[in-house]
Amino acid sequence: MTDRFLASINAALTDSDPAIAGLIDQERQRQETHLELIASENFTSQAVMQAQGSVLTNKYAEGLPHKRYYGGCEHVDAIEELAIERAQRLFGAAWANVQPHSGAQANFAVFLALLQPGDTIMGMDLSHGGHLTHGSPVNVSGKWFKVVHYGVERDSQQLDMEAVRQLALKERPQLIICGYSAYPRTIDFAAFRSIADEVGAYLLADMAHIAGLVAAGVHPSPIAHCDVVTTTTHKTLRGPRGGLILCRDADFGRKFDKAVFPGSQGGPLEHVIAAKAVALGEALQPEFQVYSCQVVANAQVLAGRIQERGIAVVSGGTDNHLVLLDLRSIGMTGKVADLLVSEVNITANKNTVPFDPESPFVTSGLRLGTAALTTRGFDDEAFREVADVIADRLLKPQDESIKAQCLERVRQLCGRFPLYRDVLQPALA
């Protein structure tokens, strides 16, 4: 009996579940053979995947390091402490909680710690580049709180901080949120701090999309200006899928510990926390700063070339990893554009643009991001070609010869920049 159980837990995935093993391999092949331009995605290191796929998966560890409700936590305590220390060092924070399962969970913990149901929160309108957790009516943030939204200025498609200030003075929110999912310009955290102080509001920065750029110093940091900062650990930070909360004030930060556990989560995912620690360690290396600079340079090349080809870009360019195409300029919807590029092995996503006449299910925009392909080694020249492939496909959607050429160019680009040279999946071997 004992031998039988040991045999089952030591079996390779290909033997124990060939269906799942096969699907994982198909997904690996898809990632290798497609151009990944979804702005919220990236390719994490094999070291991160090894940590996440380790025996730490087996360990329950409710509570904080050295304050657990379970025994046998001495090693996960050390791992979590490393993750906390690295997060603090990377972002210049006095306090960090590495337990949130996602960015949404991190935001919810902040709401739980700082607000009461019925309080007023102020964040960017989702259709202008905000996020579901910043007060969308379909999210708990939009159900529990009174929500007021600010947006970009119609002509520049950028934030007008005086308009944000006037709205805050009128509505007097308890919490102001800055940080977005589809805003390609630099965020003026100091200006938001001034507005929050003027109306007596807490200031939350959700830097999920730009955390890697902040860590590398290529985007201003919110830490010194905001009461609390949340982020995901993937996207531009290039770690596992998860969340993180940071504070400049350790005493203030500790109130979020209880909001995470037991307020909104049970046991932390220590295998994911280990992977976060690995990714944070990677981001502390000089190479990561070089990578992040290239992410922004590539986005600017992509935006510039797309515009040269006659397709409008929201706000006229980008300061970060995001490029948002305004397809009204060529009489196309985001839904159609998403399908067209997917047919030539480019993954992106349809997205609303400011003052979009289309529904969120159709949209007038296509959101692109450069973080993942930069990880593969794509440089300025390669991204110029990526821009041309996208433009060729969108500008001549009915031309089958152009479609075939685009497919071949994508195949060649993927071949020039292989992803995982030594495939990490020992269980699949």
UniProtKB/Swiss-Prot annotation:
Listed EC numbers: 2.1.2.1
GO cellular component terms, A-Z: cytosol
One Pfam family hit: SHMT
Metabolic or biological pathway, per its Swiss-Prot or TrEMBL entry: One-carbon metabolism; tetrahydrofolate interconversion; Amino-acid biosynthesis; glycine biosynthesis; glycine from L-serine: step 1/1
Reactions the enzyme catalyzes: (6R)-5,10-methylene-5,6,7,8-tetrahydrofolate + glycine + H2O = (6S)-5,6,7,8-tetrahydrofolate + L-serine
UniProt KW keywords: Amino-acid biosynthesis, Cytoplasm, One-carbon metabolism, Pyridoxal phosphate, Transferase
InterPro entries the UniProt entry points to: PyrdxlP-dep_Trfase, PyrdxlP-dep_Trfase_major, PyrdxlP-dep_Trfase_small, Ser_HO-MeTrfase, Ser_HO-MeTrfase-like, Ser_HO-MeTrfase_PLP_BS, SHMT-like_dom
PROSITE patterns: SHMT
Superkingdom of source: Bacteria
Compartmental location: Cytoplasm
Cofactor(s) annotated in UniProt: pyridoxal 5'-phosphate
Chain positions of site Plays an important role in substrate specificity: H234
GO biological process, one term: glycine biosynthetic process from serine
Binding-site residues for (6S)-5,6,7,8-tetrahydrofolate, renumbered to this chain: L126, G130, H131, L132, S359, P360, F361
GO MF terms held by the record: glycine hydroxymethyltransferase activity; pyridoxal phosphate binding
Subunit structure: Homodimer.
Family to which the UniProt record says this protein belongs: Belongs to the SHMT family.
Cross-referenced HAMAP family: SHMT (MF_00051)
Purpose of the protein: Catalyzes the reversible interconversion of serine and glycine with tetrahydrofolate (THF) serving as the one-carbon carrier. This reaction serves as the major source of one-carbon groups required for the biosynthesis of purines, thymidylate, methionine, and other important biomolecules. Also exhibits THF-independent aldolase activity toward beta-hydroxyamino acids, producing glycine and aldehydes, via a retro-aldol mechanism.
Protein name per the record: Serine hydroxymethyltransferase
Organism: Prochlorococcus marinus (strain MIT 9313)
Gene: glyA
